[in-house]
Amino acid sequence: MRLTAKQVIWLKVCLHLAGLLPFLWLVWAINHGGLGADPVKDIQHFTGRTALKFLLAALLITPLARYAKQPLLIRTRRLLGLWCFAWATLHLTSYALLELGVNNLALLGKELITRPYLTLGIISWVILLALAFTSTQSMQRKLGKHWQQLHNFVYLVAILAPIHYLWSVKIISPQPLMYAGLAVLLLALRYKKLLSLFNRLRKQAHNKLSL
């Protein structure tokens, strides 16, 4: 049985709750000692993992809608992407304010450049910012064919974000490996599209070099 438009609306409500409840839990944990011995790191990792969860969920929607024959499920993809951006912004903010501190924000640019894992993180965030800003139907109409070209960069985020997570932890544990594995799986489901994109980019680069 296919989802109806009304059911999709309720699904979106549930997804909003899924995006909001972790924030409420985090606020509670901060105020009631629910974090570990290093609360700053715990906050950074929690916000980063939550952003990654929404990224993977957004990437899951297209193959799920195709294989389950639920075309209306695509309507939830933008919502998941926006929650991914929101949590990624919280992740960046927690690093800037809690790790560096308000008095050392001038060091942020240097940190992002000199630490490779942070460089990957900020590249991912900038891409997510662009995708969030252009996610509306009006921007889709305005950008035309370039809209899809821009939003294909989500696949780059799906590569960079798990590497950023793996690189940021001092001891490799099953959790970051699990996220990386899921990202690889979701990208593998799109191997034909990704191969086509790669060949197109290679052809464009070759044509420019030939001029």
UniProtKB/Swiss-Prot annotation:
<keyword id="KW-0288">FMN</keyword>
<keyword id="KW-0408">Iron</keyword>
<feature type="transmembrane region" description="Helical">
    <location>
        <begin position="153"/>
        <end position="173"/>
    </location>
</feature>
<comment type="subunit">
    <text>Heterodimer of a catalytic subunit (MsrP) and a heme-binding subunit (MsrQ).</text>
</comment>
<dbReference type="GO" id="GO:0009055">
    <property type="term" value="F:electron transfer activity"/>
</dbReference>
<dbReference type="GO" id="GO:0046872">
    <property type="term" value="F:metal ion binding"/>
</dbReference>
<comment type="function">
    <text>Part of the MsrPQ system that repairs oxidized periplasmic proteins containing methionine sulfoxide residues (Met-O), using respiratory chain electrons. Thus protects these proteins from oxidative-stress damage caused by reactive species of oxygen and chlorine generated by the host defense mechanisms. MsrPQ is essential for the maintenance of envelope integrity under bleach stress, rescuing a wide series of structurally unrelated periplasmic proteins from methionine oxidation, including the primary periplasmic chaperone SurA and the lipoprotein Pal.</text>
</comment>
<keyword id="KW-1133">Transmembrane helix</keyword>
<keyword id="KW-0813">Transport</keyword>
<keyword id="KW-0997">Cell inner membrane</keyword>
<feature type="transmembrane region" description="Helical">
    <location>
        <begin position="82"/>
        <end position="102"/>
    </location>
</feature>
<feature type="transmembrane region" description="Helical">
    <location>
        <begin position="8"/>
        <end position="28"/>
    </location>
</feature>
<feature type="transmembrane region" description="Helical">
    <location>
        <begin position="54"/>
        <end position="74"/>
    </location>
</feature>
<dbReference type="Pfam" id="PF01794">
    <property type="entry name" value="Ferric_reduct"/>
</dbReference>
<dbReference type="GO" id="GO:0010181">
    <property type="term" value="F:FMN binding"/>
</dbReference>
<comment type="similarity">
    <text>Belongs to the MsrQ family.</text>
</comment>
<dbReference type="InterPro" id="IPR022837">
    <property type="entry name" value="MsrQ-like"/>
</dbReference>
<protein>
    <recommendedName>
        <fullName>Protein-methionine-sulfoxide reductase heme-binding subunit MsrQ</fullName>
    </recommendedName>
</protein>
<dbReference type="GO" id="GO:0016679">
    <property type="term" value="F:oxidoreductase activity, acting on diphenols and related substances as donors"/>
</dbReference>
<dbReference type="InterPro" id="IPR013130">
    <property type="entry name" value="Fe3_Rdtase_TM_dom"/>
</dbReference>
<keyword id="KW-1003">Cell membrane</keyword>
<keyword id="KW-0249">Electron transport</keyword>
<dbReference type="GO" id="GO:0020037">
    <property type="term" value="F:heme binding"/>
</dbReference>
<dbReference type="GO" id="GO:0005886">
    <property type="term" value="C:plasma membrane"/>
</dbReference>
<keyword id="KW-0285">Flavoprotein</keyword>
<keyword id="KW-0472">Membrane</keyword>
<keyword id="KW-0349">Heme</keyword>
<keyword id="KW-0479">Metal-binding</keyword>
<feature type="transmembrane region" description="Helical">
    <location>
        <begin position="116"/>
        <end position="136"/>
    </location>
</feature>
<keyword id="KW-0812">Transmembrane</keyword>
<dbReference type="GO" id="GO:0030091">
    <property type="term" value="P:protein repair"/>
</dbReference>
